[in-house]
């Protein structure tokens, strides 16, 4: 694994107390190399905006716009064969509203034949209690996948190890012109102080036919005993047909062509191209990679951005096939990408 590094390492302690020697500034120059290789062409359903979900509605829908109450909430992009799904959203309760927010990922088969979706690897965790954010050493061994900080960290670790979490079946089959659920899980906040929780999900799947996918948000419903229950398939279907984009929205991104001034990358909601970056790292013009001399160093950037190339002029962000106008222009950070 390569670590993201800057071309210069600077160590300095500001605002030193009186009578304490001013720390020495140490500059260690090093080479910043372009990472060879490229992303593959596997599409990624990437649902991360709005990150903080305060209201019910559509988070990301690739369904057709036709016959929907809010056409602008749908991106009209089907999937077939291999594709990935990445979602990350946060729920936050209020002083008088601690209802459990559910995230649902619904799939529709528009064809005249049954479609089977094989769930190759998949994991979904909440930050509390599954994977809290904790302080960790800069480097730590993780041979069996029990070291993580945050739900995204744990989900990615499982998928890279070829695991499929127990909450996911090996496959689902969807009848012609019918719906199915890939995910219907809570983001509980009721017992937390403060009442904030997040869920990260990463799935690698293969579909035998064409399908549409949507990531949705609904609060738990009440059963006849007054207890919370998960939304039903029919209730999720209704969100697809009549729901609008969940609000409030995240910050609108800075236009991608803007190269100066303040910068907002924005959060991703759409379909990106590229699930895996494969590279053979060698010295320029050679077939091998030599270690630097004693005292020397070189680095490769990981997840470099259009305005954060660290001097390499290389933008590694996955391109968006479809997106909402108020969300990120590219999949900045390449979340969930191997």
Question: How would you label these PLM feature ranges?
Answer:
Residues 22-82:
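N-terminal, Lys/Arg-enriched amphipathic/low-complexity engagement segments
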Residues 74-75, 169-172, 326:
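Beta-strand-rich interaction surfaces with strong enrichment in secreted/lumenal proteins
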Residues 78-80, 88-100, 104-106, 192-194, ...:
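Short, solvent-exposed beta-strand/turn "edge" segments of beta-rich domains on protein surfaces
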Residues 80, 98, 167-180, 274, ...:
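Solvent-exposed, conformationally flexible loop/turn segments
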Residues 89-95, 99-101, 106-115, 121-125, ...:
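Asparagine-centered strand-capping/turn motif at beta-strand->loop junctions
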Residues 134-191, 338:
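Intrinsically disordered, low-complexity Pro/Gly/Ser/Thr-rich segments with frequent PxxP/GP/PP motifs
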Residues 188-232:
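Terminal connector regions
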Residues 232-338:
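Helix-biased "structured C-terminal domain" signature
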């Amino acid at each position: 694994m390569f670590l993201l590094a800057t071309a210069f390492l600077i160590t300095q302690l500001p605002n030193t107390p009186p009578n304490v020697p001013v720390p020495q500034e140490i500059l260690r120059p090093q080479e910043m190399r372009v990472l060879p290789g490229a992303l593959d062409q596997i599409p990624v359903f990437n649902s991360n905006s709005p990150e903080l979900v305060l209201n019910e509605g559509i988070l990301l829908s690739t369904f057709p716009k036709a016959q929907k109450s809010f056409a602008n909430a749908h991106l009209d992009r089907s999937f077939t064969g291999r594709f990935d799904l990445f979602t990350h959203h946060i729920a936050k309760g209020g002083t008088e509203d601690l209802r459990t927010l559910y995230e649902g990922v619904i799939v529709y088969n528009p064809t005249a034949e049954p479609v089977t979706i094989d769930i190759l690897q998949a994991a979904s965790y909440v930050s509390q209690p599954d994977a809290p954010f904790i302080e960790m050493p800069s480097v730590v061994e993780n041979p069996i996948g029990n070291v993580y900080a945050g739900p995204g960290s744990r989900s990615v670790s499982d998928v890279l190890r070829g695991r499929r979490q127990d909450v996911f079946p090996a496959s689902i089959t969807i009848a012609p012109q019918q719906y199915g659920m890939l995910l219907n899980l809570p983001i509980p906040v009721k017992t937390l102080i403060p009442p904030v929780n997040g869920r990260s999900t990463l799935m690698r799947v293969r579909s035998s036919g064409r399908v549409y996918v949507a990531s949705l948000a609904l609060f738990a419903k009440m059963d006849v005993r007054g207890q919370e229950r998960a939304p039903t398939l029919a209730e999720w279907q209704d969100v697809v047909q009549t729901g609008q984009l969940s609000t409030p929205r995240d910050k609108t991104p800075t236009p991608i062509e803007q190269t100066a001034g303040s910068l907002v990358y924005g959060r991703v909601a759409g379909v990106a191209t590229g699930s895996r970056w494969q590279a053979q790292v060698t010295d320029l013009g050679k077939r091998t990679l030599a270690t630097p001399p004693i005292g020397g160093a070189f680095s490769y950037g990981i997840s470099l951005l259009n305005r954060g190339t660290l001097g390499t002029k290389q933008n590694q962000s996955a391109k968006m096939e479809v997106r909402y106008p108020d969300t990120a222009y590219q999949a900045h950070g390449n979340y969930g990408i191997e």
